[in-house]
């Protein structure tokens, strides 16, 4: 008999709207014993069945919903169905945008909570972020073998969020060959090198694909400052948009070395590309004091906020760094600025930019809005899936 999670009275409303999470405060009791990650049935306070979910006793998210169908088994065939459904969207995107790399599974928005899978050519890079995902590891890998027999599988479940689920960090070859130190991929006509084994996340920020392409529209003849550049995707795009020059700034020399290789790989003029290892906050202040000016600044910082307690501090950080950027722009210059913090709402981010403009004694015109690329879909019942937001601002 399947273990049942009984909700507290009145706490079923979010599940009736198909939100896939059950928080600890919504749980009245667990009827039976379940191992971490094991599949359980979620019921309302009267015992009415609501969903099939994975049990996670160590997390504030006590259960993540696998299925809304009572008779659906969570097995290899289940994962095959989910993978095939997700692939339909990616096939269309790959054909439309001439892609060989994309996010194959975007967690909850593809009906597989706690699971991220990125495809880079014939390498599938796996991140299992929840107890349920880890519990189903063998079934998922078998399903991947069935759906993608020609692909190698590499595990990058080396992220700290696993600790909240009571899980150890894991990394390494799961199936097939190990990825090369740098794997070439294509994106909107660009060739880019990806470090699957030691790079950020799964190796590359696929979610910024559309924003990188948009850079070409703003780069023509401009002097560009590319902040938090990582491996230079925005720099390559700016050069392809015929910028005057681009300075890429990052704290990682290894990332900057790959950025230079990416410029060379695309046959672009390396003399127009400069790579600087530095702290962006300190460099912006130094540039301001030295009177440096730019025509386009790209601001793509790492996540500033991990939980609600950090939100106020993150607001100050975003305001400060964007104020400094605005002070460095020539009149009519463009600022492309982003936040990848899910807790930072789009309207709040826009207000922060408006406040930054006041402090910079400038005005901004919001020209264009950005979001994560379409291979990172957001399902209607899970608005938390919308985490990346950005604006193109004309600073006057």
UniProtKB/Swiss-Prot annotation:
SUPFAM superfamilies: PUA domain-like, S-adenosyl-L-methionine-dependent methyltransferases
Reactions it catalyzes: cytidine(1962) in 23S rRNA + S-adenosyl-L-methionine = 5-methylcytidine(1962) in 23S rRNA + S-adenosyl-L-homocysteine + H(+)
Molecular function as annotated in GO: RNA binding; rRNA (cytosine) methyltransferase activity
Entry keywords, A to Z: Cytoplasm, Methyltransferase, RNA-binding, rRNA processing, S-adenosyl-L-methionine, Transferase
GO cellular component, one term: cytoplasm
Enzyme class (EC, first level): transferase
Localization annotation: Cytoplasm
Start and end residues of each PUA domain: 2-81
EC number from the UniProt entry: 2.1.1.191
UniProt function note: Specifically methylates the cytosine at position 1962 (m5C1962) of 23S rRNA.
Family indicated by similarity: Belongs to the methyltransferase superfamily. RlmI family.
HAMAP family assigned: 23SrRNA_methyltr_I (MF_01857)
NCBIfam families: PRK15128.1 (NF011707)
Protein name as it appears in the record: Ribosomal RNA large subunit methyltransferase I
Native source species: Erwinia tasmaniensis (strain DSM 17950 / CFBP 7177 / CIP 109463 / NCPPB 4357 / Et1/99)
């Amino acid at each position: 008999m399947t273990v049942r999670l009984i909700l507290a009275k009145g706490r079923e409303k979010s599940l009736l709207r198909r939100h896939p999470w059950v928080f600890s405060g919504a749980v009245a009791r667990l009827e039976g014993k379940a191992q971490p990650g094991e599949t359980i049935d979620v019921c309302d306070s009267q015992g009415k069945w609501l969903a099939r979910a994975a049990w996670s006793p160590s997390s504030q998210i006590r259960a993540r919903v696998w299925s809304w169908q009572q008779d659906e088994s969570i097995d290899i065939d289940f994962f095959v169905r989910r993978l095939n459904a997700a692939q339909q969207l990616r096939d269309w995107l790959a054909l439309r945008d001439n892609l060989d790399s994309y996010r194959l599974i975007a967690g909850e928005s593809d009906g597989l909570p706690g699971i991220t899978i990125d495809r880079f050519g014939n390498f599938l890079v796996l991140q299992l972020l929840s107890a349920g995902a880890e519990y189903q590891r063998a079934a998922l890998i078998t399903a991947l073998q069935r759906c993608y027999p020609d692909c190698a599988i590499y595990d990058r479940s080396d992220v700290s969020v696993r600790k909240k689920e009571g899980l150890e960090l894991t990394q390494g070859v799961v199936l097939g060959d190990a990825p090369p130190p740098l794997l070439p991929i294509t994106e909107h006509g660009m060739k880019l090198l990806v470090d699957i084994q030691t790079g950020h996340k799964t190796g590359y920020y696929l979610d910024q694909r559309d924003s990188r392409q948009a850079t070409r529209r703003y780069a023509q003849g401009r002097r560009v400052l590319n902040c938090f550049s990582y491996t230079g995707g925005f720099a390559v795009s700016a050069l392809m948009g015929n910028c005057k020059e681009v300075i890429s700034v990052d704290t990682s020399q290894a990332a900057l070395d790959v950025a230079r290789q990416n410029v060379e790989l695309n046959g672009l003029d390396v003399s127009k590309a400069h790579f600087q290892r530095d702290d962006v906050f300190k460099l912006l202040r130094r540039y301001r004091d030295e009177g440096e000016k730019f025509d386009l600044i790209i601001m793509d910082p790492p996540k500033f906020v991990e939980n609600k307690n950090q939100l106020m501090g993150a607001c100050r950080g975003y305001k400060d760094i964007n104020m400094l950027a605005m002070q460095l722009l020539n009149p009519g210059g463009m600022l492309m600025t982003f936040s990848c913090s899910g807790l930072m709402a789009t309207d709040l981010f826009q207000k922060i930019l408006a406040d930054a403009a006041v402090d910079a004694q400038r005005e901004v015109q919001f020209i264009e809005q950005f979001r994560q690329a379409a291979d990172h879909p957001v399902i209607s019942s899970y608005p938390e899936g919308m985490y990346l937001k950005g604006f193109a601002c004309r600073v006057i």
